[in-house]
Amino acid sequence: MSLNTLANIVPEKDTSLEKDHPLREDIRLLGRMLGDTIRELEGEPMFDLVETIRQTAVRFRREQDEEAGKELDTILNHLSHKETTAVVRAFSYFSLLSNIAEDLHHNRRRRAHLRAGSPPQDGSVTLALERVVAKGINTQQLENFFAEALISPVLTAHPTEVQRRSILDYQLKIQRLLKERDRTQLTPNELRHNEEDLRSAIQTLWQTRVLRSVRLTVQDEIENGLIYYHYTFLKQIPYIYAKIEDILERHMDKAAPCIASFLRIGSWIGGDRDGNPFVTHQIMLHAAERHSALILDYYIEEVEKIGQAMSLTERLIKVTSELEGLASTAPGLPASRIDEPYRRVFLGMHTRLIATSRYLSPHVGRQYQENTAEPYADSAEFVHDLDIVIRSLKQHQSNKLAQGAIRDLRRAVDVFGFHLASLDMRQHSKIHEQVVSELYEKNAQDNRNYPDLTRAERAEWLLAELKRSHPLVSSLSDYSDITQGELRILRMAAEIQRRFGHVALPNYIISMATGVIHILEAALLLKEAGLLQFGEAARSTVNIIPLFETIDDLRGCANVMEELFSLPEYRKMLRSRSNLQEVMLGYSDSNKDGGFVTSNWEIHKAEIELTKVFNRHGVRLRLFHGRGGTVGRGGGPSYQGILAQPPGSVNGQIRLTEQGEVIASKYTDPEIGRRNLETLVAATIESTLLDRDAIHCHTPQCYQIMEELSASAYAAYRDLVYKTPNFTQFFQESTPIREIAGLHIGSRPTSRKPSNKIEDLRTIPWVFSWSLNRTMIPGWYGFGTAVENFVQQAGNTQDVLIQMQKMYRTWPFFQTLLSNMDMVLAKSDLGIASRYAELVTDSELRQYVFTAIRTEWELCVKWLFAITGHTELLQDNPTLARSIRIRTPYIDPMNHLQVELLRRYRSGDDDDAIRRAIHLTINGVATGLRNSG
């Protein structure tokens, strides 16, 4: 074979566009090098086999060629175990390399846009600030906004993150080598060395184990989360602040003040014990210590680098008296450098930071040599020292130095402190109830058990105990393991706050909160650990955050908060939290419960009603969006998603989870990471400070249409998932759900409890499974039937369509709903899904369910096109359409292989090689899809 066709998988459309030429060249280059690696290490026959499978899969997809399907079956049926593994790995790495090329091209296009002096784009802080200034918002109002705002992506360790650290590191190396070719005029010799390095990296990838050999521990997940601080957060977050300040300065006649730190990173990794028995009090302490060790290591490195560069001599410059005083307390420098006061100051900081690290994190991180310096009491003391340096530089003609690395370090300290990230605690309300029940029964004056109490009796007892000063827990009583474990966690939380500050552990989330009782039960346990106090001196060192997850809970959450705010004791405690209450909304469980349309609509309505309740009581609202990477779990473009929130529901406050493989996709590359963070900031600024109210639908007709669509979509979804006899069997046999449980990609079990019921399955593997078999029903099912029924009942199709078309044009919520569904439909593939359906042993069940899925898919596409006016999927998003076209030739063969492997495995071939190959296909398809869980 003279032409390496694997290197020629490029976009089929728009190939004449010059802007995409570098992308095509990168894909060809990487494809050729991987093909050469396969030839060299596995032989020409293996390369030919991979190419034959790819071409046959393409024919099956694009031409719906039945003969191609049979041919593919024949090829796959006759693969040896060794061939199967090699083929899966080949397509997995083609997917990975195409992702690298695509990410690089995004950065390339953005840089070209900036070099050309083009207007700033949507999602940039530059455009967001220009828009608010143009609307008459002055700099003082902006400063006030930043002083009150909080924008916080929260990293979670949910089990769809399948890439190993080794693979991520080589991704970055390959991307760096491609950037070198792109941005540097290389000599022929340098180009040759660059290609050799690329080939070496790709060959190393081929010879690196893709899968983890053992299941991740929570400690592993903590370490995996920390790598993104090195990749992106530590450098890019200060860059964003500097950019905002520089933009504000251009709009002022004087230097812009240092704005408050509003963009911060949060984490659940090591604090989320809902359904994870491996998160203990020791693990939570380990997470806090690792966080602190990492950020202090960073400060120590930065202070050392800056100090080495600060060679300013007193013979040529003057310094302030406060800097001279600070320098006098530092350890001595060599006599040859005694005239360099800034170096003396930074040496003093360096020794104090080492002492601080040894005090806060003595057992983790780097082991520094002991010194006699006094540790910093807190990060504010370190900031104070840096401010002395900055003031001295500015007052003595060294302003440029004050605006560089020192400015970024000072901002980093303000953002990350000595704790790095705010760690959330989370536990299920049922566990709280179980612990409180035991405490009640140990202290009961009668023979009644806690579950026997009425709701009113529980509330009365809980409030009474919250106001009492003495604890319920007694050293003379024996408690169950669960109760002891929960109490140890909360006592450790108090210790972590004492060592690292309240900001290190500021939030307590109650999963499956359904009423005020669940909030009071959690409050009582927090009181037992000294984290909360009711009564005259009411206070709390944590935010108590109810998480509303099911459709019924979303519908009732505003009433719950109304009842909670009517309790004077709770309101008094809330004043110690700046009168701010956070509420978390669960996109994932509500979707599994009620489907895509109803989940989105009920969350939107809940936000509207919560905003009304909070405004009525004068309480500040912060919404925490518990979403995943896929549309079925609340994912989708962040900019459009935030702007689609109801007016008044953002108000400068937003937290949102970043989960699974999305963390790697968003934050491995620093430029892409910065752009994603900027998008959150820009959308929050615009949503809060611009008149979004004017563009939201306020007519009763819009809401009535959505109510009817939601009700119909809910019925269609529930009929399929919960009312179809043996639907669980269809799900388990037509997806790799059982095999996902054996893949070492997370520390948590895939189900909350041993059960085959859909209700007990965690949402992440539920969505992950539907993504892997390319059906993706959590992202669209029910919409088509809903519109079809609504149009039929209305009688006048044209009038109804005109109204929904207007909703699409003018209502951000409806527009985002359809846009996200459009994306999922484009990624789905019912041809491939039909092959997974063939794994279902009950032919009648298979025929019934898959016919329902296919019919609904066709209805969704039909009405999506009718409302949007489009004639093809992703018509208004050519960049994403191109991306999917690039990736599908790599993903499809892995799906076909996965079906064959599942068939073999479930037929009794339990060879380790088959099991590993199945796991490789799960990894490969997830890599290709990029947001699968």
UniProtKB/Swiss-Prot annotation:
Keywords, sorted A to Z: Carbon dioxide fixation, Lyase, Magnesium
Cellular component GO terms held in the UniProt record: cytosol
Cofactor(s) demanded: Mg(2+)
GO molecular function: magnesium ion binding; phosphoenolpyruvate carboxylase activity
SUPFAM superfamilies associated with the record: Phosphoenolpyruvate/pyruvate domain
UniProt-annotated catalytic positions: H158, K592
Domain of life: Bacteria
Annotated catalysed reactions: oxaloacetate + phosphate = phosphoenolpyruvate + hydrogencarbonate
Entry EC number(s): 4.1.1.31
GO biological process: carbon fixation; oxaloacetate metabolic process; tricarboxylic acid cycle
Xref: Pfam families: PEPcase
UniProt xrefs under InterPro entries: PEP_COase, PEP_COase_bac/pln-type, PEP_COase_Lys_AS, PEPCASE_His_AS, Pyrv/PenolPyrv_kinase-like_dom
Intrachain S-S bonds: none
UniProt family annotation: Belongs to the PEPCase type 1 family.
Function: Forms oxaloacetate, a four-carbon dicarboxylic acid source for the tricarboxylic acid cycle.
NCBIfam families: PRK00009.1 (NF000584)
Listed name of the protein: Phosphoenolpyruvate carboxylase
Organism taxonomic ancestry: Bacteria, Pseudomonadati, Pseudomonadota, Betaproteobacteria, Nitrosomonadales
Gene that encodes the chain: ppc
